[in-house]
Every structure is written in structure tokens, then in C-alpha cells.
Amino acid sequence: MENQEKQLLKEILGFARSKKKKLYLVGGYLRDLLLKRDKPNPDIDFTLEKNAINFGRELARKLHAGFVVLDKEHGCCRVVKFLRNKNCTLDFADFRGKDIKEDLLLRDFSINALAIELEDFLEGKFSQTLLDPFGGQKDLKAKRIRFIHLSAFDDDPLRILRAFSLAAIFGFKITPETLKLIKVKKGKLNTVSSERVRDELFKILGTARAYDYLILLDKLKILKIILPEIEIMRAVNQGPYHHLDVLKHSFESVNKIEEIIEEYKASADVKNFLNQAVAAERKRLELLKLGVFLHDVGKPQAKRRKGGKTIFHGHERVGAHIARNIARRLKLSNDELEALSKMVFWHLRPGYLADSNRPSERAKFRYFRDSGNEAISVLLLSLADQRATRGRLTTQESRQQHERVVAALIREYFRKQKEKKMPRLINGDDLIKNLKLSPSPLIGKILGEIEELQAIGKIKSKREALEKAKKFIKENK
């Protein structure tokens, strides 16, 4: 625990004393301390007998911090304090029962049913005074997720999904008894808000073990509750280029993207790209894995027989539409929705570029232009898709060519990002003034053509640009 964090806790304790309140540290913060797990932006949970919302509001005022009520009915609020180089999230809640012991009894898993008085904690009496009535420390050492009471998933069905996110984050096993109860209670997940489901799903996707837990969630028939669209992907045969049906291929693609991310971990460019926040605390990494899993979601609807062959013409367009609907249901931001849709829509494009072995400058320019901010996501997705495709008609040569071309495109993208952007040779006013054009969609088309020719080195001056513009107008009359 850093000094600034400790000083903040001392301030909170002083304020609690002034209000004659006994504060307990509970749950995940204590669990993470026991695991020696340092978080760049700590979340600290507190509980007190009653009036947590009023306490939090007054504390926020004193600390000059942000404040929000999370759950008025159950007396939960949040205070957010910025400490030099980190955000500290402080959650306060009323006891769930009549006292701290009953509060711990009503928590989700043994590893989270931990508490200590804030005063004892700051006085260094951790091991002597830590409350651990359900063997949470023992379960932490054994690396297992275990429910506390039979009504745990009735009290909050989201805990069903949280069992998997905790297991994925920490590399723990869920006990057989807990899995058995989850199987019985899984239907209750339908009553949980989309936002809460999304957050736990993204926690799973953010780990290096997403593939394993998606497989387990599917085996337990939980994944189809979260993503019902995947059911029609099951057992859809894809023809001789594939060795797996659509759903199995989608799972295997997630497995491969996790391998690829590991291979690229030494690349600061790729690492920084994947760590970019797209919305709130959700990053490109999680969104990429969701895009990889959903890239062929349109295939069942697009499937046709033609000339004795199975084809999926237009599945990327159908899939992008389905992906947008999924994004809306999960309450993803507009930026996330657009990114997910682009990944699915353009996922075939790198393969087309790779088919030519040495794609032209024009083809590369158009790919980067069309895929925009998702150029790298689509390229990584394409690698995973290709590696998960091992039908009898695929060849070692074609696979190596795909890898070579896509790797070169990834390098080129980051190189171009670091280069100073070329100024435009002409703009709309130049076209109106020199070519006597009126404002119209034609101007946008001409400027797009000029930008492309400039990017691939075909024109280098304003004069050349205007000449090409004249030619473009003649050819498109």
C-alpha cells in the first residue's frame, strides 16, 4: 500500500471518528492484499452499520471528491478521489444484516467474505483481527472459488457470472459444489441488467484465459443466456476449407487470438493499442476478443448452396448487423458499437490483400482508409481466423503468405502513424475556384481520389492534383 493511499485511509478514519462511526474494510480490497495484487487504481470497499449514503456524501465534501449514489434502497454510494497519479474508488454500504458477521454471511464467495475494522488495519493488526468466518484465506491459498450459502445466487444472480470472472482473473478453480449450484440457478441470469452482465463478460475477456472460460460457460449452457445469437452457429458445417463448424471455429479463433497477443507482447505499438480505453474502463483488448468470437455470427443466416458448394456470401454484412444489435443489448458505447461492427464487417479484407502476396499501394491505402481506427484489430482478427482454419483445402504456403502480408501491414500501419501527415494538395475551395464547380457530393469524391493518389505517390503538387481532378470529372460525367 502506497503512502498516499495510507494517508487517505487515515483521513477517512479521522472523519469516521468525528462522526462516531465504526468503519470496516471488506471484500476485494482485503482479498487483493492477501494475494499481493497491486491495482493501479484501487477500489476500496467499506461497510458500516447504517447511513452509509449520508456518510459518503459528507466525506466527499471534506475530501473534495466525486460522489454518486449507487443503490439508494440498499444504502450504497461511491466516492472517487484523485491521488496524484491514480483514481481511488471508495464504496460505502450499510450492513446487509444486523451486524458485520451477518453482513459477511450474505456475501457471494468465501474469498470476498473478509473484513477488518479500519482502525485495526491502520494500526497493523491485520492478522490478529481479520474476520474470516468462512475460510476465505484457506480458499485463496487453495486457489478456489466457493459459495458461502445456498441462496447466494438467488440474492444476486450476477454472482453466477462473477464466479467465472474471478476464476479467470486469478486463475482459480470453481469448486464442484459451486458449479453444481450454478447449473441449477443459471436461468436467473435472465433477470440481471445488461450493463452488469457486460461488465463481468468483459472482465473475462480481459484475461489471458478467456478461451477456457468461454468454453466452460458454453458447456454449462450459460453463454447462450448472455449471447443467444450463438446458438444457430452450432453444428453449421463450413465446407472443405474449414475443419470445424462455425461455433467451434469461433471458439478456436479466440484461442488463437490469445496466442497472437502473447506473441506480440514485446511490441510496444500493439500493446499500447490493445490497452487503449474505448469506454469507461473497457479496452480494445476485450472488444477485440468479442469481435473475434462474433466475426462469423452472420454465417448461419447467409448460408447458401451454389453449384454443389456451401457459400456464405455477404455473411460479414449480416454479421455486422447482428454485432450492432448485440452491442446495443449489452449497452456498449457508440464507439464500441462502431468498432465491433467494423471488425466483423471488414474481417475478410486482409485475406483478400494476402491473396495477392504483394498488395498494391492503392489496395493498402483503401484498406487503412476503410477500416480506420480498427485497422489493427481487423488484422489481428484475420490472423486468428486464418490460424483457426485448417480444412483439407488450406495449404501451408497460403497460411505463411497470409501471416507474412498481415504482419507487414501491421508494421506499416504503425510506421505511418508515426510519420508526419502529408498536407492536402487541394481542398474543396480550390476545386470550386479553379474548375468552376458548385458545392456537391462530386467534390468529396474528387478529394477522395486525390488523397489516394497522393498517398501512393502518384501526384506531388497542386498542379498535378488539379489535372487529375479535371480528368476525374471527364471520366465520371
Regions found by a protein language model. Name each.
Residues M1-K477:
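Catalytic cores of the polymerase beta-like nucleotidyltransferase superfamily
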